Amino acid sequence: MTRFSSCLMVLALSVFTSGQMPAQVISIPEDQVAYEFVGQFNNTPTTSQQFGYISTAKGLSSIFTDNTTQNETTALLTFVTNANTDRVIVNGPFKIINRTGTTTIYLNTPPSDFGDASTFSQGTPIQVSDYSQQVILNTGNNTFVTVHTNNVTQVTTFTLNGKAYRLGRVGNKFRTNYSGEVNAPGLSPSGWFAGNAVGVGAIANSN
């Protein structure tokens, strides 16, 4: 083996090793609040896009670029859910809606703007999960509550404040509850919500 070839191998190993530096896994603790969400949504008769930011992530600090002004313009963690409506059931004043889809959490590049949903996906995806949702809408006052379950299918190492992290592990699950209000028909956004997610089910400590 030539000296040049040996140098190339050492360089390649160094690059590989640096790329495999361990990241701290931010767990999704069972029966504890892992995330808090603030968001809006736009619906069609067959689809729903929900978007916003994470206002609290257990295990992470400084998730806003400005700790005094904590909103969509300074949020470093954002999310977008794209879902299809599978079923609608009417029971008196209640409309029960079932949806499935995908939720992506992003390491965001602020600012985001609720007037432009695409600004909540302008960062780097760091967690992807399958999503199922039940909405219970009170058509009398246009308020609703939801419960949905996310099953994490992909996580990507990211750097925040100079440290490497992974947001959970593949196989983690969390249950989310939202409370919200629907806007008048034809107006944008279709509505507003806030809520939190709690870890459900424990998995082995593996990446």
PLM regions with names:
Residues 1-7:
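Positively charged n-region of N-terminal signal peptides that target proteins for export
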Residues 20-22:
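Signal peptide processing junction and immediate N-terminal pro/mature segment
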Residues 24-207:
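Extracytosolic secretory-pathway proteins
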Residues 7-18:
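Bacterial N-terminal signal peptides
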